[in-house]
């Protein structure tokens, strides 16, 4: 089987709640780190989520 082109990443909340989303990205097309504005249920607001490695 071929090696997958996408890698799994964590999107960690910038509100320091410890909440994160897991998603995938293609590192060939998206070379810079992802930064998305998503919902954080701990603070019940939309906050910035930044890319981090999955441990």
Swiss-Prot record:
Keywords assigned: Ribonucleoprotein, Ribosomal protein
Entry GO MF terms: structural constituent of ribosome
Domain of life: Bacteria
Keyword Ribosomal protein carried by entry: yes
CC annotations in GO: cytosolic large ribosomal subunit
GO BP, sorted A to Z: translation
Gene3D superfamilies, sorted: Ribosomal protein L33
Pfam families linked: Ribosomal_L33
InterPro entries linked: Ribosomal_bL33 (IPR001705), Ribosomal_bL33_CS (IPR018264), Ribosomal_bL33_sf (IPR038584), Ribosomal_zn-bd (IPR011332)
Keyword Ribonucleoprotein: yes
Family: Belongs to the bacterial ribosomal protein bL33 family.
HAMAP family from the UniProt entry: Ribosomal_bL33 (MF_00294)
Protein name per its UniProtKB record: Large ribosomal subunit protein bL33
Record lineage: Bacteria, Pseudomonadati, Pseudomonadota, Alphaproteobacteria, Sphingomonadales
């Amino acid at each position: 089987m071929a090696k997958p082109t996408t890698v799994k990443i964590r999107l960690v909340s910038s509100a320091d709640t410890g909440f994160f989303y897991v998603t995938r990205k293609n590192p060939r097309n998206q070379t810079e780190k992802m930064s998305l504005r998503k919902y954080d249920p701990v603070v019940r607001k939309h906050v910035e989520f930044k890319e981090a490695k999955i441990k």
